[in-house]
Structures are given as structure tokens and as C-alpha cells.
């Protein structure tokens, strides 16, 4: 019986994203190809079916019954290895609205490129926090099983993950590099966190003598 699921993946130096995509027809052979993401994206004009015909050096792509266009294939051997989530990186189940909370928190981050930590969103065992140093967003969430705080850059890729987010795992690679993985319905997203210790955001709260 041929496979009816394809794995679509892309990565850069800081993040990796893979999707499981349902195929309209089964594929009887193991096929592994690489094309330029920007070229493939330029062919997709909207929601619909994509048809692929794979040749020796090109793949013929037809979007939703439109014209067929050839894309050059790139050597699989030149593709970087996909990151691996360590077995000891225990996933923490995420609240249903976690993606929404992260998006809201990103609105309170700093746009100052010299303040890398404040440009990200801090996720800790007590919840999600972001501050520009002038305003503050914090929502308490039950993430007590999270072993260590992680500061997440809210990238375009994260903003476009509309499927349900299920779990978050964090780990340290080498001495300093922090990484995290978000798994959801049909996808896995892995990226580097922002190194360093997030500032004491409670200092942004107004004092008890100030009017709120």
C-alpha cells in the first residue's frame, strides 16, 4: 500500500519547520526531493491542489489546474541535517490558547535591536511574559513542568502556524545555545531561543502608590 502522507520541511540558520501533508493519491516509492522555497512559493496562488511530476533534474508543478512549470531540483546531499529533539527533552502540554497568548505578548516586545532579550517573549513555569521596558504583558499559565525559561522570538513562521499547538519542549545544546520545539497538529517547529537571562519584569509594574 502506497504512502498517503508527505513530509514538507524547510529551514534556515535559526529555525526549522516540517509539515505532514495529506496526499490525494498514494505514492508507491520513497521520494526525497529538494527545491527552492521561494520558487515553489511563487507558484502557489491560493488554496487548492498541487500536482507534482518528478523528473531527473526538475519537478513539474501544477497549481490547482493551472499551467505546468518546471522547477530545478537541488542535491539532497547538500541539504543540512534536520535538527533532532533529544529524548530527555520532555514535552510540556500547552494550554489551548497558548498561540494566541504568544501573539498578544509579541505586541509588547522591544523593537530595539540592541535589546535582544526584550525583543523576545519569555516563557516560564509561571506563564508568558513580554516587556519593552515601558509596557508589560503577562499571563499566568500552568507550565510548572517546564524545566527552564526560554525566550522565544515571535517569527513570521510562528505567526502563520494556525493549526492547534500541542506541546513545548526545551533543551540546551552545548554550553549555551538554547533550543525549543513546538509540536502541533501535523507540524513540528524547532528554533533557537535567545541566550541570556530575562530581566526582572516585575520592575515594570506600577508601584502601589501610583494610580492605575
Range-by-range predicted roles:
Residues 1-212:
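Structural preference for solvent-exposed beta-strand-turn elements
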